Amino acid sequence: MEELDVEPSTTLVPAAGVLQKHLGFEWGPGDLLVYETNYKLRGSSSAGSPLVHVVRKDEDICSPILRKLFNESHLIFMGLQKIKEDAPSKNKKTQFVSISRNYRSVIRACMEELQQNAVTAQDGSLASQYGDQVSILLAIELIWNLCEVLFIEAAPAGSLLLHLLNWVRLHKSDVDTRAREVLQSENPTQHPAYWDVVTSLVLQGRMDEARQILSKQASLRMESSSVFKRMDTLLQTMPIFNPAGAQTLTEFDVKWRHWHEECDRCLQDHTFASSAELETLCKILLGDEDVILEQKDLMSTWYHFLVSRLLFTHPTIKPPDLHYYAQSSMNMFLGPRATPEPLDIILLSAFEFDLHQVIKDCSIALNNWWFVAHLTDLLDHCKLLQSHNLHFGSNLREFLVLEYASGLFTHHSLWQLAVDYLDHCPEFGRVYLELQIERVPLDTERKANKVLRICEDRQMSEQVRSICKIMAKRALRNNRLGSALSWSIRAKDAALATLISERFLQDYSNKGSFTDLDVLDNLGPAMLLSDRLTFLGKYREFHRLYGENRFSDAAKLLLSLMMAKIAPRSLWMTLLTDALPLLEQEEVIFTVDQTYELMSCLEELNSGTKDSNQMEQEEDLESTKTELLRVALARNLATAIVKEGTIET
């Protein structure tokens, strides 16, 4: 897309910069943080305001009703991505039109709900907000519908005008309301809006409905019934092209010209001179542009004027000729002094078949990326944007989808939808996902597990480790050691696993028992992640064997922990003390060699450097434990020698 050639809108930040302070800012994923600095434009620096202002462009993402739009359009988007490239073109076109209509039905449903809320809202500002959102969705649906007609359906001459008539009827539906009011009144022909309704129906090409209302007048005015019958005949015989019929465009054109000549003859013969309203209708049927333009209050928009003008002057308009009529209709309707609104410029670009200008102007005018992202994606699938690449490597479709998905990532629940959008951005989607997924707030373990599944399914190993480390540290801060250990193992972080294992052992030293046994008993091969974790797992296994009265296995495991030197030195005395109950069993558990090894460990422990900060009471306790162990080891050694000597004999 080209560089922005219009001035961006100004956003006022309340109370910021009042004291002529410089403003600092920081970009976030979906918003901008603005704050006052200590520096003034003039004079010495001083303390600024402590407030940080959050400036957000896309406010719609916070609306509960519009979230339904985002959720439902996500399903349509995913269905569109499944359409196979090799499907027949005719089948694909039908599918694309159906998908486009699905998008529009979602917009309409959302718009209706917003309108209901605007009516029932007690708060005036909230009602105004709903009204603004309805206006935006109306414009979006209007543009989308026109793009559907011109680009997706690509209606040819003849059919094109029929589609444009349906487009105008859909977006100028107040005629139906006024028609009901007229018909339901006591005297429809005397209703102030009677002729306005008839004229409006004719301008929309709804001739049968116009005839129905005109018949009310004809039945009351017997003296001029022939005049009304003549108008009824003109309305009834007006040719309408039927794309499904056998009639060619040339045949239709000949038939239409004959009908047009008949209208002109009626006007020249002053057939309707007795009724100014019928004469005006005849001039409209004849395509008198000045008379049609006089009804601008009934049409209210230049594009309604365009379609009505084409209906009565050029019903077989070809797509390439549309832009001329569109430009001249807008100029005639708005006048030389009026400035077109952004919506007018966008619609004019569509009539000029300038797709990229439509997308560019919509990106500037609308307050979120939803519309341009989904419309561009659909148009790209229709192969209408293949020639347009951006200077920075991505194509237009991917750029807009990336922007939309990035906005979704700022919402507490919609971020999950964003993942699917990024999955379908082949060039930069993976990079964006890796950056954005780490910014998702991990409020709960359930949410963290959702994020992890997304990362694991996509082999994003770095993000998996990062998330697991965050959760492990959070659990550790909250003293949830079992959860912390599980997360550190999933992160494959040896240093963190060692730290948590230390906390487990410290907790055991203080309480005399282990917590989170379900985690410790099911470590499996994961205990090999670090030496300290291995020790923790094996030490817990020792306690389990001891509890199951498997004393011999427990003794071997305890001794292997001592000899392998993987136990922290601070726990040696604890391990040796754990051997005391085994040494005092009636049955000899430790062999002579094993007893010597335990003695060696005890002496090595006592020969080490003493902690100068160790209190006297602690020294006495250590000495008592040492004496008890020496006695128990000596007694066990004697018993083991006797037993082994007896066996040898």
From Swiss-Prot:
Species lineage: Eukaryota, Metazoa, Chordata, Craniata, Vertebrata
PANTHER family per record: FROUNT PROTEIN-RELATED, NUCLEAR PORE COMPLEX PROTEIN NUP85
Q: Name a GO molecular-function annotation.
A: structural constituent of nuclear pore
Keywords noted in UniProt = Membrane, mRNA transport, Nuclear pore complex, Nucleus, Protein transport, Translocation, Transport
Q: Which Pfam families match?
A: Nucleopor_Nup85
Tell me what this protein is called: Nuclear pore complex protein Nup85
Q: Which GO terms describe its biological process?
A: mRNA export from nucleus; nephron development; positive regulation of DNA-templated transcription; protein import into nucleus
Question: Gene for this protein?
Answer: nup85
**GO CC annotation terms, alphabetical:** nuclear membrane; nuclear pore outer ring
Similarity-based family: Belongs to the nucleoporin Nup85 family.
Q: How does it assemble?
A: Component of the nuclear pore complex (NPC).
Please explain the role this protein plays, according to its UniProt record.
Component of the nuclear pore complex (NPC) that seems to be required for NPC assembly and maintenance. Involved in nephrogenesis.
Compartments in which it is found: Nucleus, Nuclear pore complex; Nucleus membrane
